[in-house]
Design a protein with these regions (language model features):
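Beta-strand elements of repeat-based all-beta scaffolds
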Residues: 1-176
């Protein structure tokens, strides 16, 4: 016989129909805090009477893009955007003052991602990462004339991948 369980969660909303709280099946209540512009500014948790900070602060630029986040564990991320196209160009993640991720992004004329490069050096993370996980990596993507992903490849440390996709041509329309 199958082990069937029901999980119930709840949510409350403010007068602007924004989530105020989410209650999870284990009793944890996550509260969302908003700035004057109505953007999420921070998130806190209360589980069995223990308060904790999930997201300490989120900063936005005048266009509404997220430019800074600080999590409850102190991890900080900064985001830099291309002013002309408003696309994410660089994302830097730091923890304990050390760079964990340093991603840069490349796009084509229709905003397909062509490449992602992480320039972070895992050997500089000895305090955080004794196993030397992560670090430098690069990924490239190609699209067909309909902007469908047809090729992806990448390399990280001693591993690499290469994926090729193809799409069939529809000869006759589907009839229902």
């Amino acid at each position: 016989m199958a082990d069937i369980r029901t999980y119930v969660y709840g949510a409350t909303y403010d007068s602007w129909n924004r989530v105020q709280t989410m209650t999870y099946p284990d009793g944890e209540v996550v509260t969302y805090h908003y700035n004057a512009a109505g953007q999420v500014e921070s998130m806190t948790s209360n589980k069995q009477g223990r308060q904790s900070v999930i997201v300490d602060r989120i900063g936005y630029d005048k266009e509404g893009h997220t430019v800074y986040t600080k999590l409850g564990n102190g991890t900080e991320t900064t985001y830099t955007y291309d002013k002309q196209h408003e696309r994410l160009q660089v994302m830097n993640l730091t923890a304990d003052g050390q760079t964990v991720m340093e991603n840069s992004y490349r796009y084509d004329a229709v905003d397909n991602i062509l490449g992602i490069t992480n320039a972070a050096n895992p050997t500089s993370l000895m305090k955080l990462n004794k196993a030397k996980l992560g670090g430098r990596s690069s990924h490239t993507y190609e699209y067909d004339e309909l902007n469908r992903l047809i090729h992806a490849s990448g390399k990280a440390k001693h591993a690499s991948y290469d994926m090729v996709m193809s799409f069939g041509r529809i000869i006759a329309p589907l009839i229902s």
